[in-house]
Design a protein with these regions (language model features):
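Phosphate- and other anionic-substrate recognition elements at nucleic-acid/protein interfaces
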Residues: 1-162
Length: 162
């Protein structure tokens, strides 16, 4: 076994983590689950804001991948109109959550294909695994404001909109 093979085996080994990427839409949320590189993510859909559905799908994914109930769950989603309440809920569930600056997500400029949720979920899950394996330049993680800071920002946005 040469150095590159050894590195690849180490990089793709399942360390017992469940990775979860969200694609947040206005009507539905798409969830992509994986336990390691080299596999397509398990994709599920819940209604937007359905926290019971999110929790249920996390538990189903643990069972599907044969993971214990106490397995480390890492999640990510792009910062946007939904704010940070989803992050707070996930942390409350014991999920390690990252909110990603959408402008920092790498894009293949040569690709002449449309952006789709399926590509986004697969890419997000892969990038989350890369980030977890120490590749910090994959994207920029947003600093999470306190609930009070977020509320004051929202009040300001509402006043500007009027």
């Amino acid at each position: 076994m040469n150095h590159l093979t050894a590195h690849k085996r180490e990089y793709t080994r399942n360390r017992g983590n469940l990775y979860l990427a969200f694609e947040l839409g206005s009507k539905e949320w798409k969830l992509g689950f994986s336990v390691g590189f080299g596999q397509r993510p398990r994709e599920r859909v819940v209604w937007a804001g359905d926290l019971v559905g999110v929790r249920r799908e996390i538990e189903r994914a643990k069972k599907r991948f044969g993971l214990s109930g106490e397995v480390r769950v890492l999640s990510c989603y792009e910062a946007g109109r939904d704010g940070f309440w989803l992050h707070r809920y996930l942390v409350h569930l014991g999920v390690s959550s990252l909110v990603v600056d959408s402008s920092s997500v790498e894009v293949n400029r040569r690709a002449r294909r449309a952006k789709t949720d399926r590509m986004d979920l697969g890419k997000f899950v892969s990038m989350l695994m890369r980030y977890d394996n120490g590749e910090r330049k994959v994207w920029s993680v947003v600093r999470i404001p306190t609930a009070e800071q977020e509320d004051s920002r929202q009040l300001h946005r509402d006043l500007v909109a009027l």
